[in-house]
Curated annotation (Swiss-Prot):
Pfam families: PTR2. This is Uncharacterized transporter YclF. One of its GO terms (cellular component) is plasma membrane. NCBIfam families: yjdL_sub1_fam (TIGR00924).
Amino acid sequence: MASIDNESIIKSVPQKGFFGHPRGLFTLFFTEFWERFSYYGMRAILLYYLYTETVNGGLGFDKGTAVAIMSIYGSLVYMSTIIGGWLADRVFGTANTVFYGGIFIMFGHIALAYPGSSIAFYISMVLIIVGTGLLKPNVSSVVGDLYTKEDPRRDSGFSIFYMGINLGGLLAPLIVGTLGQKYNYHLGFGAAAVGMLLGLIVFALTRKKNLGLAGSNVPNPLSKKSAIGTGIGVIIVAIAVIISVQTGVLTIKRFIDLVSILGILIPVIYFIIMFTSKKADKTEKSRLAAYVPLFIGAVMFWAIQEQGATILAVYADERIRLSLGGFELQSSWFQSLNPLFVVIFAPIFAWLWMKLGKRQPSTPVKFSIGIILAGLSFIIMVFPAMQGKEALVSPLWLVLSFLLVVLGELCLSPVGLSVTTKLAPAAFSAQTMSMWFLTNAAAQAINAQVAGLFDKIPETMYFGTIGLISIVLGGILLLLSPVIKRAMKGVL
């Protein structure tokens, strides 16, 4: 297939029709809104479903295993984006890959909606991991195809798109969480499946008219010989996994440990390859060296942020006073706090950085602030933990904890991908999105091992130790920021 030039793509996309933006933004906004609705809705109740007793409609895992499974699931979702990016570049193009990913996700939620089967759960996890890996890294790329690089609407277009992500994430726990916890878990998972179906319908009905050629390019097509070899390799791996599970060689515990190792090993291999590559010159290797402490800092940040959906979700279920003046809260509703605070504070941060202009903090300093705020979000939880494990505490403690970590996220996350693309060697530019996603994959791989300590040690020690480590790491990064900035060789 011949490569399609950017000019042809732009000409094929109607440039007006959605608040002054290309009409294709409507398609991608609502597709991603419903995909995030399905994902965050499912995630809001999945942990509870895993550890709820079977007589009450759950799968009956112990809490430590349930938290580890959630962390490994999250890690694999981010690892799978490497495969999703590769398939888009070599086989399907980004738009087709997004659509196929949505289909996998929908069937994954349908499998979860099947009552009382651990087999259905494992099948659903495979489908959702594969589907999210296909969709997540590619839908943003299609948004980029709608604009020229010089288009002044480009940044605001991405802002509108990310608003769709956060609106989906905000509404999902409230709707899916209520259905799942108040009525039936499988009804909640079914609602998540319907959400993804609506996203697919919007995409299918409006794609041809709104997206034109956007996302249809396959920049580096796979040869027939390579495709056959890859297909055979995938089949062999799948058979090996099935045999390992059936024979008891691959247990849940071993699988969790294996993914934890991969979550750390894959980024290390990435960095070794880039540092030893002859395609990277001295300046690029200096910038890459500057990126290493930022990468480590991001892993620390996401390790705390992602525990909002695991450890803090358990805390909300067991330790928070959920009855307020006769009004009953659902513990899953706390998962709406993160996107709610992002929607509220993201415009304020955007205004602040614009107002400060050249006086705004450098990227290493922004990372430092984000990591310190994440640490403080756990330090705050030490105070309610002092009341003992039997005491029910005010929900405001969790609200404050989520607020602090979101403020940190708004310092670190928006500049994370940007600085990754700037500091990665040019020869590896295609892998920059995957590099940034690997910070989250590594964080959740670590969480799978660390989170098991929550029930084994005092809560004050758990929150206090992790919070203190994060604050110290943020402080070290702050002290090193002038050195890191020099090594960045002019990159802001």
